[in-house]
């Protein structure tokens, strides 16, 4: 599955809520999100209009590592929710 190229920080924030991530704080244009599913895990999401593809892939890879699955599986769960 291809990574969406026009996702904003707000889009990613909304999608990550499916996996139990909640906004815990915001500093400037960066949002810190935390999940307590399968242990506590934090990711920082830039609140930009369009996320750079490498940034989006890195966040998905980090989330996948936490949930012990592939980035493809995470992306399927996120896109399947909407």
Model-predicted segments: where are they?
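N-terminal first-folded block
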Residues: 1-27
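Short, flexible active-site loop motifs that bind/organize anionic cofactors or intermediates
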Residues: 2, 46, 64
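Intrinsically disordered, low-complexity segments enriched in small/polar residues
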Residues: 7, 26, 37, 78-80
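Residues in flexible loops and secondary-structure boundaries
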Residues: 9-11, 15, 41, 51-53, ...
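Glutamate identity and glutamate-enriched acidic tracts
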Residues: 14, 22-23, 40, 68, ...
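A short, structured beta-strand/loop element
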Residues: 22-57
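C-terminal structural segments of small proteins and small subunits
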Residues: 51-82
